Amino acid sequence: MPGKLRSASKSESEGTEESMETLQKPSEKKTRKEKPKSKTDEATEGVEEAASSKVKAVKKKGPSEDDVGPPKSKKAKKQEEEPQDDPASKSKTSKKKKEPLEKKAPSAKTKEMKAEEPSEEEADAPKPKKTKKGKEANGDVGEKSPGLKNGLSHPKPDSSSTQAPGEESETEKEIPVEQKEGAFSNFPISEETVKLLKARGVNFLFPIQAKTFHHVYSGKDLIAQARTGTGKTFSFAIPLIEKLQGGLQERKRGRAPQVLVLAPTRELANQVSKDFSDITKKLSVACFYGGTPYGGQIERMRSGIDILVGTPGRIKDHLQNGKLDLTKLKHVVLDEVDQMLDMGFADQVEEILCVAYKKDSEDNPQTLLFSATCPHWVFNVAKKYMKSTYEQVDLIGKKTQKAAITVEHLAIKCHWTERAAVIGDVIRVYSGHQGRTIIFCETKKDAQELSQNTCIKQDAQSLHGDIPQKQREITLKGFRNGNFGVLVATNVAARGLDIPEVDLVVQSCPPKDVESYIHRSGRTGRAGRTGVCICFYQHKEEYQLAQVEQKAGIKFKRIGVPSATEIIKASSKDAIRLLDSVPPTAIGHFKQSAEKLIEEKGAVEALAAALAHISGATSVDQRSLINSQAGFVTMILRCSVEMPNISYAWKELKEQLGESIDAKVKGMVFLKGKLGVCFDVRTEAVTEIKEKWHDSRRWQLTVATEQPELEGPPEGYRGGRGQRDGSRGSFRGQRGGSRNFRGQGQRGGSRNFRGQRPGGGNKSNRSPNKGQKRSFSKAFGQ
């Protein structure tokens, strides 16, 4: 086809020149056809009426051009064939029409067509056809402002009108599919609600909201699963509010709630309640949870409630006291359903819901279950409350990654004794003084201690179950408002909390279950923003980290601790930002001192010292990139060929640096592909090693600036060095065995591997029935 079209257009262009003289003679018809052209020329000056006459002229021209045959039958054929030409609205159709025409060819029609086009603007054959079809496709919509939209003021009307449909399609392409599907006009949402949503910064429904709206609005039971930070709260809040406001009757005092939303934590309940209140002014929204006085809540029930949000404990208390009536419920929402129906909450939830639910009754309230994680057991438990015809919306499905895709997942290997100091450095580099960070700890004690640790230079406060409810609310409000930059919390803050602009999430150790990791990491990278989640782990916790990777469908990028250079660079940027916040009135008081400093130290030295002090980076410890230990520097020894064993590197080090290097090197491990090794040396030994070492064609020694990819786990500290003929260090096996393998020695070989010690068992053996028992807190440094 393309070949035919090209050859056809070639022959047509040749035929055009030959037929020019013949086409100039006929007649009154030709004269009549050229009259609209003069009108078209006038239309190029911006007159809209001329534009519409041009559209008509083109339409008239189309059929007359397409009619092939003697002049006498032309009118009749024009009337018969006119409807067939009109529907043509695509360029493909125009190309298809040319083939048969050219087979019939050198008729008057083809010549006439070709003669007219060059006279207008020497364009290719398809151009006028595209113009006509583009205008026909626009229809009545284009009539509103054809002169302006289609650019008729341009001297080439055909080309400009040809661009109009293209311009429209480009505009359509610019609008993401999500925005098209989530446009408010697609849903029965009142103008009042739309205004309130826009005031909250919501200009269209997010995917989970768009896909669940009609299910919720039509009264169907629903299980919905979507990643954290995708707007699940509004997924049920918007349709329920529209439904209740649509059937709003007289608001009687003391009326019972029609909607009950249960949340696992007080903080989440408070937030859900606020989300409801922000998008309705007609309905009464109340939030009941523990740690607050009963009196105010009882008064709210006397006034009447339309939507009740709360935690299971306090709702159950009001039921038992006979103060709360749930018999009029029409809608029940379980937010974060996996935790809600967990062992600790299942009994309370069942006791609450049995008041409003009857066994196998179609009159039971609509039940909505929402969460980012839905284990299989959730579906089994949910069937007790849901109708058999329930709907399911899953925006995660079989996708391997369950965690938020807007979050970068990093992991740092660090002993618990160094953890607080390294976390302080991490916050400096990844968040800074102006950013917001949430640190998650496993215990209340850890959260309290870490928030008060001097290694964290930013203002930090803790949030956990032992803090009074009123103080918890003040703390969360302060963090939201940016009054302080670091929040150290237990799982209290892991679920559902929508805190804007959290730059960094730090997990002090891998959580016990993958769901916790997903929810914790989801506190950053929300509502389209990107974020970073850094998980700290010890050698003992590598298995737990691997489990998180496997079940959450993510891959941690193993990184080293921030280097001294990175810390200083980040700290200086922070200090410069802080200078911008100093008011001009305050600067005047320090000018005299500044001038004196400049005279004594010089401008650059004085300012550099001031920046160092402001940033708090007056002293920065070098740390190992392998295990984060302070006072060590990681070095890389690269080899141009694959190394058969690690002794190959030891031999080269000793040849150049002497036997004494044996005592200075720690934790040697292969690089990826065995094309070198990396190891730690004391900070004070680095200069001496650099002076003695000379690179060769095969060997190059450098100081590592970032953690390299490793072949496997590093050798045990203090067990990674020794002579090539036997194992040395604290994990001493029999001297006759190889350092790298598993020789059975007097104490059972290296405890890094598979040897059994007489009284204990292998340290790395994870079987609970073998070896000496160790306390959990000692093992994990808690």
Curated annotation (Swiss-Prot):
Modifications after synthesis and translation: Acetylation by CREBBP/CBP inhibits the helicase activity. Deacetylation by SIRT7 promotes the helicase activity and overcomes R-loop-mediated stalling of RNA polymerases.
Q: Where is the Helicase ATP-binding domain?
A: 213-392
What's one GO MF term for it?
Answer: double-stranded RNA binding
Which part of the chain holds the cross-link Glycyl lysine isopeptide (Lys-Gly) (interchain with G-Cter in SUMO1)?
Answer: K114
Sequence motif Q motif, location on chain: 182-210
Q: InterPro entries given for it?
A: DEAD/DEAH_box_helicase_dom, DEAD_box_RNA_helicases, GUCT, Helicase_ATP-bd, Helicase_C-like, P-loop_NTPase, RBD_domain_sf
> Where does each sequence repeat begin and end?
720-724, 731-735, 741-747
Q: Where is this region: Disordered?
A: 1-184, 704-782
Q: Which domain of life is it from?
A: Eukaryota
**Where, subcellularly, is it found?**
Nucleus, Nucleolus; Nucleus, Nucleoplasm; Cytoplasm, Cytosol; Mitochondrion
Query: What chemistry does it catalyse, as a reaction equation?
Result: ATP + H2O = ADP + phosphate + H(+)
Q: Where do Basic and acidic residues bias regions lie?
A: 26-42, 99-117, 134-143, 172-181
In terms of CDD domains, this protein maps to: DEADc_DDX21_DDX50, GUCT_RHII_Gualpha_beta, SF2_C_DEAD
Amino-acid positions noted as binding ATP in the UniProt annotation, renumbered to this chain: A226, R227, T228, G229, T230, G231, K232, T233
Locate the region 3 X 5 AA repeats.
Answer: 720-747
- Which family, according to UniProt? Belongs to the DEAD box helicase family. DDX21/DDX50 subfamily.
Alphabetical list of PANTHER family matching this protein: ATP-DEPENDENT RNA HELICASE DEAD (PTHR47963:SF8), DEAD-BOX ATP-DEPENDENT RNA HELICASE 47, MITOCHONDRIAL (PTHR47963)
The name this protein goes by in its record: Nucleolar RNA helicase 2
What is the organism field in this record?
A: Rattus norvegicus (Rat)
